[in-house]
């Protein structure tokens, strides 16, 4: 399968501070990669590298031709005094045709919001509008920076359901950044745990194995949410230095 984007041993420094060290990953059509990590781990920098906004100091980046990327930012800052409907907000995107706006909103089950004020939207509604905006250029790769931030668990289930539907319909790759270190989208193909370098990687454990979780959030939640169990051979001290766990050596 041809990669959309691949990073090989990428490192990024800002001044004397090493933010990313020897990071490798591969984004493929129809596959979901979820990136986890604590605050300050370099997740946002890695996203900017994938988007082509940051040039690494070391390593190799390969992109598939004129790659179309749809991006959903972590936060949206709007002037609350500026009257702005969803329709007008989406038309601010360069190259957008007005006849494409309603179909994009309907695709994310948000057609009814077309004339709603942006400032009045809930967290989940805002994420759907931003996702519709990302779909306007028919992306081959969706980059979602903490798409479930500020959304409750039921909203997360609905968003994950929608993301899974879109990746199947579009056969697009998905890079998803998560602020939750353990609860991830169950249908993620690969999870990477980042703390300036790749600490560990693997697949999520589907929560359908946990009856207590099913009783709390229902079978639909169990289908869309998964637990990722970390398997680090080290920890990081307060200065960010690697401290190997007992029984492991640096080799």
Curated annotation (Swiss-Prot):
The keyword Transmembrane helix does not apply. Pfam families: ABC_tran. GO terms for biological process: response to zinc ion. Its main location: membrane. It is an enzyme of class 7 (translocase). InterPro entries: AAA+_ATPase, ABC_transporter-like_ATP-bd, Metal_Ion_Import_ABC, P-loop_NTPase. Its EC number is 7.2.2.20. It is a peripheral membrane protein. Keywords: ATP-binding, Cell inner membrane, Cell membrane, Ion transport, Membrane, Nucleotide-binding, Translocase, Transport, Zinc, Zinc transport. Transmembrane segments: none annotated. Residues 5-220 form the ABC transporter domain. SUPFAM superfamilies: P-loop containing nucleoside triphosphate hydrolases. SMART domains: AAA. GO terms for molecular function: ABC-type zinc transporter activity; ATP binding; ATP hydrolysis activity. ATP binds at residues 37-44. It catalyses: Zn(2+)(out) + ATP(in) + H2O(in) = Zn(2+)(in) + ADP(in) + phosphate(in) + H(+)(in). Coiled coil: none annotated. One of its GO terms (cellular component) is plasma membrane. NCBIfam families: PRK09544.1. Belongs to the ABC transporter superfamily. Zinc importer (TC 3.A.1.15.5) family. The complex is composed of two ATP-binding proteins (ZnuC), two transmembrane proteins (ZnuB) and a solute-binding protein (ZnuA). Part of the ABC transporter complex ZnuABC involved in zinc import. Responsible for energy coupling to the transport system. PANTHER family: METAL TRANSPORT SYSTEM ATP-BINDING PROTEIN TM_0124-RELATED, ZINC IMPORT ATP-BINDING PROTEIN ZNUC. This is Zinc import ATP-binding protein ZnuC. It comes from Shigella flexneri.
